[in-house]
Amino acid sequence: MKNKRVETIVFNAIIAAIYIVFTLLFAPFSYSTKLLFIELRISEILLVLTFYNKKYGPGLILGCFVANLLGSDLGPIDWLIGTFQTALSILIYMCVKKLPLSNLKKVVIGSFVNALQCGLIIGSELTYVYCDSSNYFSFFILQFFGVFIGEIIILIIGIVIFEISFKNKELRRLMEIK
């Protein structure tokens, strides 16, 4: 029992480290600005992993917080809102997992809902921080679609990667994927 707990902590530390490295390595695409239309945070591919096993959620939440702490120009607002949004995504995957559908349908639905809520939450955050005009609605729509499109692309890539990877029975066993 104790070894499983240590194993889970180690897996989460690895996931957090990978999330941080990929977010910072691809920082120009990981963080939205007024000038960048589509936010492509490559590390969000790991978010799909929590659909298959929720125990990897803490690593993603920690990774998101540290990546935003180290790389985001938005400061404390992004540390809090970005981390909250990641936690909400994990919760959505946990809820969608209970639907009476095939796993593939559930992960696709969960990813779509997550991309929508990410666009709404992060789009609102970016509008609040960057919009310096009275045209908030137009600015928000641009930010929403930029984040939504980027997130849906990344989550689809994540679905493909994990669906293919988890055909390997040994990997499924190692990562406790049912």
Spans of features found by a protein language model:
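Membrane-embedded alpha-helical hairpins and interfacial helices in multi-pass inner-membrane proteins
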Residues: 24-36, 65-178
